[in-house]
Each structure stands twice: as C-alpha cells, then as structure tokens.
C-alpha cells in the first residue's frame, strides 16, 4: 500500500495514474524503452557490426569527466566481448586541446589506420575535427547528449544524440545513457543478454553527470544502485577495488557523488583520464590496486586545491547579483567545475568560474534548477570563442577583452530569465504536514522515491515546529525539532538562524527535507518563518 502523502506528492509531480506511480516507485529493466526509437540507432548498429565483421580498426573517443570515462570503458569492454579485436580508445586531455575531439587525436587516428571512430559524450560540436576524419575516409559515429546547433552539425556518418529530436523519449540521458541505449540495441539485434557491468557503469556516469533522474535515467540508476549496494555484486575488478580502497560497505548514491565519482574525475582534472579508464578495464588485481590508489591520491590533492580556491571564490562574490562570474588567472583549470558547483550551493545563483590558459580565458559553468544554462549562453555567443554543454553544466572560452562585457551580458540574460526578480530563492513546499505524519509509512515511501536528484528532488515539507538543544556543528547547528508529541534530530544552517533570530522554544513555520540514513532519519531545515 503506497503512503497517501507520497502518492499526493507524486501526483503533483505529474504521475497521475496508479500505473505511473507504481512504475516510478518500482523501476524495472523491463520498463526500458525500445532503443530503436532513438534516431540513427539502426544505422549506427549496422555500421559497428560491419566494422567488427571486417576487422576494421575502431577508435572510441571519450570526454575526460566521469560520464566520458564510464562511456568509454562501457563501450570498449562491450565491443570486445562481442568480437571486436582491432579496437582502441583515446580520451580528451583537459590541458592540451580541452573538451571535445582534438585535431591532433584525429590525425593520429588516421596515421594509425583507424577506419571507424565512435565518439562518446562528445562530438556534437566538433565540426572541424570530424571533417578531417571524413576527408581521410574514416567513418564517424557521434554518440552524445550535449545541446546541438541544428543549423551547424558535424559531417558525421551518424549522430546519435537524443537532443536532435525534441520529441524523443531520451532527451534526459547522459552520454553513458546514450551508450547504454546503443548497447541495448546491439543486444536486441544479436539476441544477447545485458551484462551487469553495463548497468554499473551507466549508473555511475548518469549520477555524476547531474542529469534528471527520471524516466530511463531512473531505471538505470535505481537498478544499478541495487547492484552496487554490496561490493560483492560488483563484476568490474577495477571498480570493486576502488570501492574497497575507499572502505565502502554499502554503496549509496551519496558515495557515488562524493567518493567514487570524484576519484574517477580526479584523473582527468589533475592528470590523465586514461588512468581511470585503465582502472575500469583492467583484469589484473595488482594493476587495479595501483591505479585505484593513484586516482584516490589525486582526489586528495584535488580536495586541498578546491578548499583554497572555493574560499577565494566566496570572497569575490558580489551582493545583489543574479550570477557569480568569477575570474582568477591563477586558478587550476581542472577544478573550475567543482568550484562553480560550490558557488551555486552557496547562494543558488548560476555560476561561471574562469581562469587563463594560453592567453585566453576558459572556464566551467553550473546552473541551479531554475535556469537553462545552455540557452543563457546562446544569448551571449557573440562574446564567446567556444561553448558547449547542456541545461545544468557547460564549458566556455573567450578573449580577455570580452570578459567584462560578457559578465554584464550574462547577468542581464539571467535577470530576464528570472522574470526581473529573484524567484530562484523562493522555496515551495511539496506538502504541508505535521511532525506526527512522519511515520514508518512516510519513511518507507521516501525510500521508494530514491534516488533523489534533479527532476526527482527530495520532497520539501512544511510544518509548524519549535527547536531546542541548539549546538554548533561545522557550518550548521544541530538542534532538536519538535511539537507537542514528536521529536526529531535536525540540522539548520547558521545563515538561517542569523537571518531569523531563531530562539529555543518558540514555534516557527519551517521548510525542511527528511534525510534518510541507514537506520534512522533527521530533518534538514532549509527555511524558517
């Protein structure tokens, strides 16, 4: 029996029928959509199968982030398993040619006799590089999820990008999700079963790319997390070794976001993403331990760099703005995206963090849940040398002389998107309840709603309650939230208590989320009136 309050929340979110609600709460692999609904799928599979049959050399080319690393590893290992022996991979290098397919990588592929290039998590905007490959007689299949310019697409043989078809059922997919559908299509054609490692890597890439956790993404992440809960279920030696080195007993979405993902990302941020790919592909335990230890150490180094840069960025944030656009030529290029995310968390503004490279300004952008970042950057494209990404994240580069004008333009665009007021800071509850309503049924319903993320946010509740036993805890306060009959441990941000002069024993109207632990829960108070 589904908890009535959970059912009401889901109905407000568009799950109007019992069948919709049941499929949402109990996702299964059998609910996956037909992969051949993705335009270009049949042609892509035919081209790949023919290349394998003819023993033509295949290159998989991926991006350097978690999505690109998992996509590359996923497709490489799968194609090997179905008979591809003449296959290699290459990964973008953040510090040489940056995001996308570098011209040098294409020229090397041509020299190496590559006949088919398959891009993963990139390629939609790599017009010049793909043109070089095509002129040399190399076939190119682009698999990507980044926003395309429909009037200026690369001359690839096939482009598998769900965003080319706005009516597509797959527009929320990450790059690894597109690869997942490609593999699903090949499995269907060849009458073979999915292997568990396909789901594991697709889950990690999807979670870390911060895409909406609905529809296909919900199935991929929910089913993948069930497999990852016990490390003994992990069929990928390198991933299992990393989980062991991180001392994770029951892997959760939080572990993926804040431990596994950052380690995989650290390879591309500070060194070379191929270390992470090699880890996910190796069948040798000693090599797995060596690589997992290396990327874990890189992540520790990354954390120290981030701490200092975030503090510097916070100090530069201006009041009464709609955006954070911050520039420091000494900031490390590999951590800009993380710093941008921290700035969004700090004040809920779309944030762009910039540094200098080779005489140009380059950086990473992150959005809050209310702004389509890619659309905003399209409004500023005349000031940019290059940009690419999607609704929530993007990369940009521009000339120094255009920086101040870009700041002003981006600020104005975001202001207009917000309807000339700061609506992004308004908090809207999913449901008003009493603390008495927080019972086993509600908790079990919230567990079924997991994993939470964009498109499936942890519900915000509104209740009248008082607080007591206020104790300082890092950047927050630990408190007890209570009414006349129930008490719950809670966390409240210092900024909220300062702004509202919160006093023990007084009743307030509070907005909060219920944070689920392994054996208990607590409230995270996000606003008090």
Identify the residue ranges that each predicted region occupies.
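Metal-dependent catalytic neighborhoods of phosphoester/phosphodiester hydrolases
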Residues: 100-102, 128-134, 511
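Amphipathic alpha-helical transducer elements in NTP-driven molecular machines
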Residues: 127, 173-176, 180, 218-222, ...
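Mid-to-C-terminal polyanion-binding domains and interfaces
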Residues: 54-56, 287-291, 297-327, 379-529
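Active-site cavity-forming subdomains of large catalytic enzyme subunits
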Residues: 107-172, 180-188, 197, 214
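Histidine-centered active-site/metal-ligand motif
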Residues: 145-146, 332, 390, 476
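Active-site glycine-centered loops adjacent to acidic/histidine catalytic or metal-binding residues
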Residues: 63-65, 144, 512
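Acidic, metal-coordinating catalytic cores used for nucleic-acid/nucleotide bond scission
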Residues: 95-96, 122-125, 518
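Hydrophobic helix-and-loop "lid/oligomerization" segment in the mid-to-C-terminal part
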Residues: 2-116, 136-137, 155, 187-405, ...
């Amino acid at each position: 029996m589904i908890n009535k309050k959970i059912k009401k929340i889901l109905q407000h979110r568009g799950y109007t029928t019992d069948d919709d609600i049941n499929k949402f709460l109990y996702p299964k692999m059998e609910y996956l959509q037909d992969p051949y609904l993705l335009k270009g799928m049949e042609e892509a599979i035919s081209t790949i199968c023919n290349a394998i049959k003819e023993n033509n050399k295949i290159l998989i080319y991926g991006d350097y982030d978690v999505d690109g690393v998992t996509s590359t590893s996923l497709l490489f290992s799968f194609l090997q398993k179905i008979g591809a022996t003449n296959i290699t991979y290459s990964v973008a290098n953040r510090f040489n040619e940056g995001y996308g397919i570098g011209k040098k990588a294409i020229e090397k592929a041509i020299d190496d006799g590559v006949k088919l290039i398959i891009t993963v998590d990139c390629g939609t905007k790599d017009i010049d590089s793909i043109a070089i490959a095509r002129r040399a007689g190399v076939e190119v299949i682009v698999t990507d999820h980044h926003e395309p310019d429909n009037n200026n697409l690369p001359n690839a043989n096939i482009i598998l990008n769900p965003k080319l078809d706005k009516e597509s059922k797959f527009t929320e997919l990450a790059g690894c999700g597109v690869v997942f559908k490609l593999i699903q299509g090949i499995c269907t054609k060849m009458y073979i079963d999915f292997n568990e490692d396909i789901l594991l890597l697709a889950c990690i890439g999807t979670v870390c790319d911060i895409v909406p956790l609905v529809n296909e993404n919900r199935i991929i992440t929910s089913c993948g997390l069930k497999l990852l809960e016990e490390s003994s279920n992990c069929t990928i030696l390198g991933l299992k070794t990393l989980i062991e080195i991180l001392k994770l007993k029951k892997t959760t979405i939080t572990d993926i976001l804040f431990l596994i993902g950052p380690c995989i990302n650290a390879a591309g941020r500070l060194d070379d993403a191929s270390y992470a790919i090699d880890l996910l592909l190796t069948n040798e335990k000693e090599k797995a331990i060596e690589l997992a230890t290396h990327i874990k150490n890189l992540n520790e180094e990354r954390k120290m760099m981030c701490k200092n840069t975030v503090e510097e960025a916070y100090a530069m944030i201006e009041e009464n703005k709609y955006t954070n656009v911050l520039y420091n030529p000494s900031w490390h290029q590999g951590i800009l995206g993380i710093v941008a995310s921290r700035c969004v968390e700090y004040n809920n503004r779309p944030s762009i963090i910039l540094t200098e490279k080779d005489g140009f300004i380059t950086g990473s952008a992150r959005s809050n849940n209310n702004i389509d970042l890619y659309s905003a950057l399209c409004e500023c494209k005349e000031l940019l040398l290059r940009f690419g990404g999607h609704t929530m994240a993007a990369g940009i580069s521009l000339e120094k002389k255009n920086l101040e004008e870009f700041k002003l333009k981006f600020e104005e665009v975001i202001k207009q998107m917000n309807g000339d007021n700061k609506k992004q800071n308004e908090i809207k509850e999913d449901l008003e309840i009493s603390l008495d309503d927080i019972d086993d049924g509600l908790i079990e319903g919230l567990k079924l709603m997991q994993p939470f993320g964009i498109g499936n946010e942890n519900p915000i509740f509104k209740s009248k309650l008082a607080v007591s036993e206020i104790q300082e805890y890092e950047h927050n306060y630990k408190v007890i939230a209570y009414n006349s009959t129930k008490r719950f441990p809670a966390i409240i941000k210092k900024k909220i208590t300062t702004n509202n002069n919160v006093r023990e024993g007084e009743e307030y109207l509070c907005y909060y989320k219920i944070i689920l632990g392994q054996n208990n829960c607590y409230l995270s108070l996000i606003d008090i009136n």
